[in-house]
Amino acid sequence: MIVSGTKWEEDLKRAGKSKYKALARAIRDGISSGQMPAGQRLPAVRDLAHKTGMTPGTVARAYALLTDEGRLTAKVGRGTFVAKTNVMPRTEVEPLINHPNDENADFRSSRVPDVGQGVLIDQAFVRLGQSHRRRHINYPTQETDFEARAATAAWLDQDRLGGVTADDVVLGNGAQNCCLLALQSVLRGNHPVILTEELSYPGVRHAARLLRAQLVGLPIDDEGIIPEAFEQAYRAHGGQVLLTAAEVHSPTTIQTSLARKQALASIARKFNISIIEDDCHTTAPTDIPSYRAMLPEQAYFVSSLTKTVSGALRFGYVVAPTRQAKVLRQVAQSSFYGVAQPILDVCADLLTSGAAAETRNKVVAETRRRVRLAVNKLGAWDVRWREDAPFVFLQMPIGWRASSFAMACAKKNILIKPADEFALPNGAAPNAVRLGVNTCVNESLFLGAMDDMNALLGNPVVTMES
């Protein structure tokens, strides 16, 4: 199928802006017709891009689409192959969690750094076991999770949230789960629509797919979502909810300004659009109020202990709009009855004993240190960064495509995320990559990888020819 002089090449020439779809369709047809049998290896992304006159990013996007459909399978270090016919289509584009190992410098995920919190968590479990205060036999209830909800309310910045009590808080299994709960409580109708940033954390796509909702991407600038685009998108597509990472946007690190938040809240109020503010990447204090404070009857605030204390606990929370906590709690109970009681009790202990605050302060300091190290190494390039964001956003210099740079890094056992992986279905992405700064426990590995990336960025021609 992928040979010169065939009909699919003419289809690509007529494809316009949808070349990746045309390429995916051509490969799909080749598989269906038997021209591409199971196990056949596809050309390398750069080779096929050269043959077709497309960019490597376009080819990579077509491959990713077909991998998502289960028609192709990617094997690290070996290439992309036609999948076996008995392989069921995958429901996920990519895993949300990447497991690091000692051989790779893995910058794909935004993790909490190890600052000794494991010992504090162990001590909390010991205190729980020695207290014998619960038998840990029955299901968790609204009464038995009250201490954890009260501790969470006390943990939150009351000025930023507009005042929060335990009755406003609904607990879940991490921020991703809590976003799903909020979406389930808001979405309705036969064609639910979620409005969100045009670049979003991949979990947004997973949530929309799970809830069978349409995603509509909104353009952003240096101050956040553009208000006019928000209103235009609502008029064109409808939608019940805006899901936004306003304080620390992933992957760009953009912080939505106060004036911009006020403008967006005004539009949401005008059209009765709910807002879910995903605050999971925020670790340091901020002076900008949340949407929950600006629009208390329509806004949800979602976060967790994952980026400030530990991802192992899977402890997340939603601050519901006023008079909506009962509805949200019913959604949670219908989904999983409640967060496991031992986790509720241990997290309440961590929050009330000061262990969580101690850990958060160390995490903030370590994140700032790692960001400075990364910026010092890559400062010659176009890097967007903030000391309180656990990742940096690196624009590619002339001569590099993000997908090609990612492949070149992979050859050096450096794993990164191109901006394409944050694009919505059918959306565009800038020529950039995101680098999580807290992903390498070994600092020499971290610094060596930064040096390698710096060298690659400065020498794209030699790298592409090799």
Predicted regions and their residues:
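N-terminal basic, amphipathic alpha-helical segments
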Residues: M1-G129, R134-N138, Q333-A340, K362-E366, ...
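Short beta-strand "wing" residues that participate in macromolecule-binding interfaces
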Residues: T73-K75, V164, W385, I416-K417
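Conserved core of the PLP fold type I
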Residues: R135-F271, T282-Q298, G458-E465
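Hydrophobic residues in well-ordered beta-strands that form the structural core
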Residues: T196, G217, I275-E277, C347, ...
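Conserved core segment of the aminotransferase class I/II
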Residues: F301-V364, V462
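Short hydrophobic/aromatic beta-strand micro-patches
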Residues: V319, F393-Q395, G436-N438
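Conserved glycine-rich beta-strand-loop-beta hairpin in the small C-terminal domain of fold type I
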Residues: V364-V375, V383-M396, A408
